[in-house]
């Protein structure tokens, strides 16, 4: 945009929302130390050890992955848990696809619960000025109902495979948990949550907790810094610049006009349904984060803006389950699985993803509109 003269360099700098980048960085530091301490592998191993049947394993994967993703970012959970799940299933001689798809979908659905669950929620949380507690309260029934629908549909679709008993005892690979480091990491996350619940700024509390984590970890900061996804931060910064360039070129104004015509309605049901349909389409065409950025300047001018912001967060998250390419979490699971000889086909995923997305979107609209 700058090279082609669409956007002057000072405008490009001004377009970057540093609140979002600071929030992401703070969360990445805390999550990075929890990764170093093997907290997520330990949590996955804990679930696997308690899954005596295929149905309980699927339930544990969907709900466990969802609840972890609700607070520690869905992409991270899929990145860490997928290899643990495959290692446990390897000797079992069972097809891993139901559990892998369950992990991806559960992580996507569960991540809707809080502003730390996924990048688009972080954007919505900051731009809507939502409180951490308020966002969580509104999204709690959405997330729990969504996880129940996801598990129920997966269990029905794969009922034939899930009826087969395990031929071998499910044994998870033991994890060497670094208890002192994990304890400090969870304590710093609890401090961050307390700060947010007390009304603290989302980015300020996140970066303060991340900095404190570096100080109290008693580990070389390089371990956590290596786990910061600098390419993602750069991607976000670049995305803000690109979207500002489109805005300067008039593309965003054109979208705004048509979006306003579509969702400006006295009926919250009609508006929420229209927003969800648009977000589901955009999220699978241009990805969910750019789709949310497109709404940044539109939503504040809409009636019931706070409701619409929550619908944007919900629909951009749930629509990630529509297709295999719908979210980064899906692609991470598919890539990790293929590297170990397990292939998730586009058609198999869509056979589950389309109905799950429609069911969870309908549930999300119903709950959010009913609760205001």
Pin down the residues of each PLM region:
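Alpha-helical transmembrane segments and, especially, the helix-loop junctions at the ends
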Residues: 69-79, 96-130, 150-154, 279-296, ...
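Membrane-interface alpha-helices at helix entry/exit sites of multi-pass transporters
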Residues: 55-60, 90-102, 131-140, 269, ...
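Small-residue-rich segments of transmembrane alpha-helices in multi-pass membrane proteins
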Residues: 1-4, 24-27, 52-62, 103-114, ...
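Juxtamembrane and boundary regions of transmembrane helices in multi-pass small-molecule transporters
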Residues: 94, 133-177, 187, 318-372
């Amino acid at each position: 945009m700058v090279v082609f003269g669409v956007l002057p360099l000072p405008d490009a700098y001004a377009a970057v929302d540093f609140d979002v980048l600071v929030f992401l960085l703070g969360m990445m530091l805390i999550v990075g130390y929890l990764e170093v301490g093997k907290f997520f592998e330990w949590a996955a191993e804990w679930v696997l050890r308690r899954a005596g049947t295929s149905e309980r394993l699927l339930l544990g994967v969907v709900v466990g992955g969802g609840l972890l993703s609700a607070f520690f970012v869905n992409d991270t959970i899929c990145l860490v848990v997928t290899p643990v799940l495959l290692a446990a299933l390897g000797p079992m001689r069972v097809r891993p696809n139901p559990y892998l798809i369950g992990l991806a979908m559960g992580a996507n659905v569960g991540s809707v619960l809080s502003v730390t669950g996924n990048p688009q929620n972080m954007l919505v949380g900051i731009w809507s000025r939502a409180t951490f507690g308020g966002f969580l309260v509104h999204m709690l029934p959405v997330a729990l109902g969504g996880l129940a629908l996801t598990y129920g549909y997966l269990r029905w679709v794969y009922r034939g495979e899930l009826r087969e008993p395990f031929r071998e005892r499910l044994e998870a690979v033991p994890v060497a948990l670094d208890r002192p480091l994990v304890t400090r990491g969870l304590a710093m996350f609890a401090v961050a949550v307390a700060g947010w619940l007390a009304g603290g700024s989302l980015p300020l509390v996140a970066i303060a907790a991340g900095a404190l984590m570096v100080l109290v970890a008693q580990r070389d900061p390089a371990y956590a810094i290596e786990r910061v996804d600098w390419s993602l931060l750069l991607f976000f910064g670049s995305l803000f610049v690109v979207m500002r360039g489109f805005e300067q070129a008039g593309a965003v104004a054109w979208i705004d006009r048509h979006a306003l015509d579509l969702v400006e309605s006295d009926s919250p049901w009609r508006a929420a349904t229209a927003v969800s349909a648009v977000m589901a389409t955009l999220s699978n065409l241009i990805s969910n984060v750019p789709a949310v950025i497109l709404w940044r300047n539109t939503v504040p001018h809409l009636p019931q803006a706070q409701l619409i912001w929550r619908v944007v967060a919900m629909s951009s998250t749930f629509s990630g389950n529509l297709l295999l390419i719908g979210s980064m979490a899906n692609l991470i699971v598919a890539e990790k699985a293929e590297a170990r000889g397990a292939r998730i086909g586009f058609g198999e995923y869509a056979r589950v993803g389309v109905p799950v997305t429609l069911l969870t979107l309908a549930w999300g609209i119903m709950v959010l509109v009913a609760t205001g």
